[in-house]
């Protein structure tokens, strides 16, 4: 077939303009009647919507592309596996999967290392209004599927709140409260709409995490967090991941078994854990 470069360029331009008009920022997306679907990972939302309209010919309620289940067992690790979790404190996706990630580690017995990174816009990655709007609406759909009461009240923690929390993180981690500090920050920002940019908001985060606010205040302006957070970013990039949350599952030799990006990939990590433990059990019998 003969290709007309000028016609192709015009077609691409028109399509990009239409996509922007409909409220999205990226390609390879599905759009149906006012709602966007990010590739095959979101088709189950579309399937459910079409089923509600009675559009499925066989009247079956079985999905073609269901959201894969996050399996929490039955096998349990005994010191062989390590899961590295890369969250950020401004990420809606991080906020809906943070507790599930901790639960997976606890129930399977794997070692969990939380490696926070700066939010993308604080790393110099540009973000459009369309992108921000889509991410919030998509995270709300995903949270509903996970049966999480999320996003009814949100107070964007961009900037100083994130830096303040990261400034406290090394101290909190040494106190055995690092996970709790991050969790409470996300809870306040994305579940309760608390202004973490206020003294009272940050004080609430700290005290909910089981830490002393008087001690915390003296650590807010220490710079020890910066090399740690930057190292985490570089490590994440080395895995071929750029966004959050990202995951790396490795064995006792430090070899990467799975490295992946997205809250909608925790199911993959969970299955990789069970597959590894099953193979190890079989080889030892």
Question: Language-model segments: which ranges?
Answer:
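Active-site oxyanion-binding pockets that recognize sulfate/phosphate
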Residues: 2, 87, 125
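C-terminal cap of thioredoxin/glutaredoxin-like
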Residues: 1-73, 79-84, 97-104, 184-285
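Glycine-/small-residue-rich active-site loops that bind phosphorylated ligands and cofactors
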Residues: 37-38, 92-93, 160
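Short active-site neighborhood of thiol/selenol oxidoreductases, capturing the structured segment around
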Residues: 77-93, 112
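Structured beta->alpha junctions
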Residues: 34, 89, 156-157
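Structural alpha/beta surface segment adjacent to cysteine/selenocysteine redox centers
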Residues: 95-189, 277-284
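Surface-exposed loop/turn and secondary-structure junction residues enriched for glycine/proline
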Residues: 40, 46, 92, 120-121, ...
């Amino acid at each position: 077939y003969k290709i007309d470069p000028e016609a192709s360029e015009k077609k691409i331009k028109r399509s990009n303009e239409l996509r922007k008009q409909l409220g999205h920022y990226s390609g390879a997306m599905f759009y149906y009647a006012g709602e966007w679907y990010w590739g095959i990972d979101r088709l189950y939302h579309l399937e459910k919507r079409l089923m509600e309209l009675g559009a499925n010919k066989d009247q079956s309620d079985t999905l073609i592309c269901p959201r894969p289940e996050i399996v929490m067992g039955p096998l349990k690790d005994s010191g062989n596996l390590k899961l590295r979790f890369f969250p950020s404190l401004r990420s809606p996706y991080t906020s809906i999967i943070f507790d599930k990630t901790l639960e997976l580690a606890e129930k399977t017995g794997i070692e969990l290392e939380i490696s926070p990174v700066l939010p993308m816009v604080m790393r110099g990655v540009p973000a459009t209004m369309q992108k921000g709007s889509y991410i919030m609406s998509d995270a709300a759909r995903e949270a509903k599927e996970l049966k999480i009461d999320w996003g009814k009240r949100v107070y964007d923690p961009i900037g100083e709140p994130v830096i303040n929390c990261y400034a406290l993180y090394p101290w909190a981690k040494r106190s055995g409260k690092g996970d709790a500090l991050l969790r409470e920050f996300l809870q306040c920002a994305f579940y309760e709409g608390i202004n973490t940019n206020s003294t009272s908001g940050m004080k609430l985060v700290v005290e909910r995490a089981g830490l002393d606010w008087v001690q915390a205040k003296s650590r807010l302006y220490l710079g020890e967090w910066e090399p740690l957070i930057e190292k985490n970013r570089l490590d994440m990039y080395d895995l071929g991941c750029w966004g959050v949350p990202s995951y790396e599952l490795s064995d006792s030799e430090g070899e990467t078994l799975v490295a992946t990006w997205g809250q909608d990939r925790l199911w993959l990590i969970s299955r990789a854990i069970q597959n590894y433990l099953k193979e190890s059990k079989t080889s030892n019998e």
